[in-house]
């Protein structure tokens, strides 16, 4: 969520940013926010003036009564009653206008970084850099599920009976490999100075709306029936939520956390779930990292964070590349984002294994994550997140040979 004062003073810039994200249907929201914000401030000003007048006039009643001026006192009482009546009308009206402003502001996308390429969807994402030489075999490589089945390491049929498509049982050595990958990623990030964290796997609705857009929420989140709780789609949401409604000492920043968690996702949208694999599924495990820092440090942390993921995969001898996400592929709260993609020898192409994002102060503004500087002034922190590794997406078989296939 952008700053209301910024929108009020720069409506054309906000509209231009909406156009860059190919969300022209949201353009009317800017004028609507300005209109309702004006009404809210006018209602607030009128209410403040009336309260001051009420206090002033009310003091006259006792004095008039003491002077025996009953009729004048009654007239003043009637005036106070009229003021009170108007205040009862204004207070809900002011809240209605403020709620409408907040509702619209939650839908307006964050201002993207000038370096973000302009494009409508992920087909316009731009390759930044490659790391490692991709293996291009001249023989057919089995599907990853087939490889796991050879080791009795996966049971999709049983999972389908128990939970439906998009779930799996990992068994034996494959399950151990999965756990080992998670432990390796955990220790890798601890070695980078991050604090290990196991967060809650459910979060309340005010945290959900604080960390993501309504579109993301609808496409991803599972709600617990009858409860104000959602299963997390990624642990970054729970970790960022840790700082909700806090005022943090500037000297203690940055906060750097890494966490393991199961992740639960509807996977609604163009991609959907993968019928016979472990790539796009409803439940998986992931090691994640987040940073809460000063605004002037977020660009530097962004560069560090995606490089950590690249370093992790290169330590496993997996070729990777980074893609700069274009404007239309950025979620609404993101200022800048890049995908890390790993090479698949079987598919002979790269596929996404992680995503690094700088959200500026959007999440902090929604969740009221503030920082107190040395001068005593308060400001909103910047937040970033990045995938360390999602083990189901980590290549199980990266150095194939004709004999193995």
At which residue positions do the language-model features occur?
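A carboxyl-terminal module marker
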Residues: 336, 346-365, 370
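Active-site loop/lid in soluble adenylation, ligation, and acyl-transfer enzymes
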Residues: 110, 114-125, 131, 138-270
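Conserved small/polar residues in nucleotide/adenosyl-binding loops
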Residues: 397-404
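Short, solvent-exposed loop/turn elements at beta->coil junctions and helix N-caps
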Residues: 204-205, 324-331, 356-358
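Conserved phosphate/anionic-ligand binding catalytic regions in large, soluble enzymes, centered on
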Residues: 386-396
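Extended C-terminal subregions enriched in glycine
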Residues: 298-335
């Amino acid at each position: 969520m952008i700053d209301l004062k910024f929108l009020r003073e720069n409506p054309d810039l906000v509209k231009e940013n909406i156009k860059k994200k190919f969300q022209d249907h949201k353009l009317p929201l800017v004028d609507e926010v300005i209109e309702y914000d004006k009404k809210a401030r006018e209602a607030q000003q009128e209410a403040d003036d009336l309260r001051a007048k009420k206090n002033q006039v009310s003091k006259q009643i006792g004095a008039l009564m003491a002077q025996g001026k009953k009729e004048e006192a009654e007239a003043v009482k009637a005036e106070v009653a009229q003021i009170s009546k108007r205040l009862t009308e204004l207070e809900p009206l002011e809240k209605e206008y403020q709620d409408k402003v907040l509702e619209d502001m939650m839908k307006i996308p964050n201002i993207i970084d000038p370096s973000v390429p302009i494009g409508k969807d992920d087909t316009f994402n731009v390759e930044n850099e490659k790391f490692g030489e991709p293996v291009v075999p001249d023989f057919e490589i089995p599907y990853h599920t087939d490889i796991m089945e050879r080791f009795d390491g996966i049971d999709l049929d049983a999972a389908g009976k128990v939970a439906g498509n998009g779930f799996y049982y990992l068994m034996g050595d494959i399950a151990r490999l999965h756990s080992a990958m998670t432990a390796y990623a955990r220790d890798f990030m601890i070695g980078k100075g991050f604090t290990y964290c196991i967060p809650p796997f459910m979060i309340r609705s005010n945290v959900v709306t604080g960390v993501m857009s309504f579109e993301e929420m609808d496409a991803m989140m599972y709600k617990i029936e009858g409860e104000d709780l959602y299963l997390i789609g990624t642990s970054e949401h729970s970790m960022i939520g840790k700082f909700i409604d806090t005022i943090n000492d500037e000297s203690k920043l940055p906060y750097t956390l890494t966490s393991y968690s199961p992740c639960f996702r509807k996977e609604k949208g163009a991609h959907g779930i993968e019928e016979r694999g472990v790539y796009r599924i409803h439940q998986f495990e992931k090691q994640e990292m987040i940073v809460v820092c000063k605004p002037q440090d977020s660009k530097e942390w962004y560069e560090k964070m995606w490089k950590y993921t690249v370093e992790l995969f290169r330590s496993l001898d997996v070729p990777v590349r980074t893609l700069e996400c274009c404007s239309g592929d950025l979620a609404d709260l993101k200022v800048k984002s890049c995908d890390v993609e790993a090479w698949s020898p079987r598919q002979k192409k790269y596929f996404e294994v992680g995503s690094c994002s700088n959200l500026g102060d959007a999440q902090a503004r929604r969740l009221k994550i503030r920082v107190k500087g040395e001068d005593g002034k308060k400001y909103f922190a910047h937040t970033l997140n990045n995938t360390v590794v999602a083990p189901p997406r980590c290549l199980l078989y990266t150095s194939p040979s004709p004999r193995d296939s």
